[in-house]
UniProtKB/Swiss-Prot annotation:
This is Signal peptidase I. Residues 65-289 are periplasmic. The lineage of its organism: Bacteria, Pseudomonadati, Pseudomonadota, Alphaproteobacteria, Rickettsiales. PROSITE patterns: SPASE_I_2, SPASE_I_3. It comes from the Bacteria. It is a single-pass type II membrane protein. It holds the Pfam family Peptidase_S26. The gene is lepB. One of its GO terms (cellular component) is plasma membrane. It comes from Rickettsia bellii (strain OSU 85-389). Its main location: membrane. SUPFAM superfamilies: LexA/Signal peptidase. The active site is at residues 68, 131. Keywords: Cell inner membrane, Cell membrane, Hydrolase, Membrane, Transmembrane, Transmembrane helix.
Amino acid sequence: MKKLTSTTTTLWDNKLFINNLKNFMQTNTESNNNKTTAQEWKSFILVVVIALMIRILIIESFVVPTGSMKATILENDRIFGTKYSYGYSNYSLSFFDFIHLFKGRIFARTPERGDIIIFRPPHEMNTRYIKRLIGLPGDKVQLIDDVIYINDEKIERVESGIYVSEEGRKYLKFKETLPNGKTYFSYKLAPVLGIMFNDKYGNTDAFYVPEGEYFFLGDNRDQSNDSRIDLGFVPFENFIAKAQFIWFSTKITWWDSDIGVINLILKLKPWAESIRFNRIFRNLYSIED
């Protein structure tokens, strides 16, 4: 009887041990799963924070919807702009645009003539413009017969052939050199049947750039709303980023929230066929004839 009792007790102890082991392993597995989930969330949050900090402080992507900088920049070019180039202001910090964390700019660096800059226009603060910087604070800027004069000195301007747009429109192409040596191309609508485009902004009054503000022009001189027209002068505080290079470009846009899923799918093929491979990773400051 003692042996039977001993055997029964031993069997019971073994079962109890196995059950305890199973419970321990299950609890340990659940604990490991919880730890893994927590670690995954921490990693995800860290990645998001790093991505946001890169966008806010270092580099941001911008899509150009208009042709005011044609042919340097075309419609639907996607551009990377460096946020640190001129320091930081309320308007250069993504997601904090209108919170007004501080006044002016911190870590400010001086812009240079010829820089292509993304900024908020004073007359339309809910949007972004991209133009070329021409006039610095204290400068006198004037256009006479389409030629830029800075402080009464004519910049170098040499005709460099014809540019034909994707729509078939012809433009006269000019190589311009600013006083600091920066060179770029500007474009003017070519005559149609010998008739010149009505050039009411090729001759302007003199613009005296105030302290802390800047004068901008679009490279597409006949089709740009810039400092000659409604834009006026742009405060330094409104600068967002310095445009650097094109990372992607298409002739047509794909995404449109108004056309529905089926039409988006149907649009995918022509959109892919419209990719401008020759513009991908193009430096905006390289001169290509």
